[in-house]
Amino acid sequence: MKRTIVIPALLLLAASAVAQTTSAQTTPAQTKNPVSTALRDILPGRQKNTVAAVEAMPADKFNYKPSADQMTFGRLVTHMVETNDLLCSKAAAVPAAKVEEIKDTDSKDNLVAALKASFDFCSDALAKMDDSKLEETTEGFGGKQVTRAWISMVLAGAWSDHYAEAAMYLRLNGVLPPTAKK
């Protein structure tokens, strides 16, 4: 009888030890700046996919809009540039990028260059960011005071949202989005 209790108990103990060892091996290393580190880690993939999506859209489709109420693809790209410049500067507490004004009707080459420059600005800004300023407030949308942590979360969400929008525009024009090609 004791044997029937001891053997399962030992097996359970061994399984628990293996699970803890496996868990410890897959847990990411602790960092003093988890939010800013996460943004820096996420940025290269979002940049690669978003720039590739914009580059994939034929130049003659930059004036395409899915419906009368939606923005053109060119406007979507200028929105991405404006968002990157604004949110990366606010999240990292650095001055906004000094860039030439772009228009929705600019050439594809100009819009792609502006988008790349905005992601480069984000990379530089986020390299200076640390989590010690996340509790600081800054002006958000509509003049509302928000924390840099709030801005950081909106920034990460915006990158995903913008790629998803670009992918939808591509599909509506018969173009396969970059992440669908894998």
Where are these regions (language model features)?
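N-terminal signal peptide c-region/cleavage motif recognized by signal peptidases
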Residues: A14-A19
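N-terminal secretory signal peptides that target proteins for export/translocation
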Residues: M1-K2
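Short, contiguous alpha-helical
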Residues: R40-P44, K48-V54, K61-E100, E139-K182
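Short, helix-capping/interhelical loops that line the mouth of catalytic, cofactor-
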Residues: Q20-A38, E82-K144, N173-K182
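Solvent-exposed, charged/polar functional surfaces in cytosolic regulatory/catalytic domains
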Residues: N49-A52, A56, A117, F121-K128, ...
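Sec-dependent N-terminal signal peptides
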Residues: I5-L13
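Secondary-structure boundary/capping positions in well-ordered alpha/beta enzyme cores
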Residues: D60-K61, S132
